[in-house]
Regions:
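Charged, low-complexity intrinsically disordered terminal segments
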Residues: 1-386
């Protein structure tokens, strides 16, 4: 059973209303309501948009919006949306909507994925987070449903996200998009500061805006909470997280015990020993598959599309919103407490009992695979459940 939290997380920060959407049905209803309320424009970007009941309903709402004169633009990642039939999107195009696909599969930029998730309506309201357009992300029932988060934003911060979408859309639609131009777009739109700031990441070596920001926040923090569906960062990042405890602070990690990709679970378990040795508390979420991406460093909250692994930190296109507000951070930490209550703690003794030679070998191999391959590729590699 999933433990709910109270009161609801619905805050105003710097003139922006922020409302957390932890429930799948709540996400679905909010998405449809937001699309149906659009008057001028709808910008949609998703890594995965599937041709199931949820995807069909969302496409219908977008098609209706286009038919009533709303400018609708949809940007999808070809690898994540590879199962969609071209004819599925025809009604949207016929109604006057537009769409394009990020990154042809056969390309010298094969490893880069547009892993972002966002809906921007009228340049004023937005939905961001980790959930894709798929029936298992937009429900709270069934063995295949995902535990995830979206954040609804209503306020001036959305205008910057709309501008970012426009630049990414134009870059994707260009017949010969250059990676160096993409890097400039990411850097340009990550320059803001203040209580609410956007941080993006992509194929940028050592100056990737979101990783740079989250490292800075971790190094300054006395308390860090990480809820990450996929967790396989570098040894340097593990040392930084452990350093929070070593200097007298607290650090918790909540990651998945269930997934449709067993390699990602094994890869996370490869990191546990280093974290536990430094005093980090580690938990595995039990009731459902976990897909959340939430990071809290003292009063700074990071929420968006990025996992805490190599691909999200240094390769994929990702978007994160950084909110620095004490009350909001405490509310989000209370939310994490609820996730911890539904998790099993992996103590040093528990980890030691599981860390057989065979398992450690499998964990190490999985860590290598998820670092070098796309999620949809490693999902097809059957390493078996433990």
């Amino acid at each position: 059973m999933i433990v709910s939290f109270s009161p609801p997380i619905d805050y105003e920060v710097a003139g922006n209303r922020l409302r957390l959407l932890p429930g799948g049905l709540e996400r679905f209803e909010t998405l449809i309501d937001t699309i149906e309320a659009a008057q001028e424009s709808i910008r949609v970007l998703f890594y995965m948009f599937t041709e199931d009941a949820a995807g069909t309903r969302v496409l219908h709402a977008l098609t209706q919006a286009a038919a009533r004169g709303v400018e609708v633009r949809v940007l999808l990642d070809e690898f994540g949306c590879g199962a969609i039939r071209p004819a599925f999107l025809d009604p949207l195009r016929d109604a006057g909507g537009m769409y394009c696909v990020f990154h042809p599969t056969i390309s010298r930029r094969y490893l880069i994925r547009n892993h972002q998730k966002m809906v921007v309506v009228d340049g004023r309201r937005a939905i961001i987070g980790g959930a894709n357009i798929n029936e298992h992300y937009l429900t709270d029932e069934g063995p295949k449903h995902w535990r995830d988060l979206w954040l609804f934003i209503d306020g001036p911060a959305v205008e910057k996200l709309a501008d970012y979408f426009d630049d990414i859309y134009l870059w994707t639609a260009h017949p010969k998009p250059l990676v160096k131009k993409l890097r400039r777009i990411i850097a340009k739109h990550s320059r803001g500061s203040g209580p609410i700031a956007w941080r993006f990441s992509g194929p940028i070596a050592n100056s990737n805006p979101w990783p740079v920001q989250v490292v800075k926040d971790i190094l300054a923090a006395r308390r860090v909470d990480i809820v990450a569906a996929y967790f396989s960062p570098s040894n340097a990042m593990l040392r930084r997280i452990g350093g929070v405890v070593e200097r007298g602070g607290e650090a918790r990690l909540v990651t998945a015990s269930k997934s449709d990709n067993n390699a990602t679970i094994a890869a996370a378990r490869f990191t546990y020993g280093r974290l536990l040795k430094r005093g980090v508390r580690v938990f595995e979420y039990q009731p459902a598959k976990l897909h959340t991406k939430l990071y809290i460093c003292d009063d700074a909250v990071h929420i968006g599309s990025a996992n805490f692994d190599f691909r999200s930190l240094y390769l994929n296109l990702e978007m994160m919103l950084r909110v620095e507000d004490r009350a909001f951070a405490q509310a989000m930490r209370d939310y994490v407490d609820g996730e911890v209550a539904n998790s099993m703690e992996i103590t040093p003794a528990v980890h030691k009992s599981k860390a057989t030679l065979w398992r450690k070998t499998k964990w190490a191999l999985s860590n290598f695979l998820v670092t070098t391959m796309d999620y949809t590729v490693t999902r097809r590699i059957n390493l078996g459940q433990e």
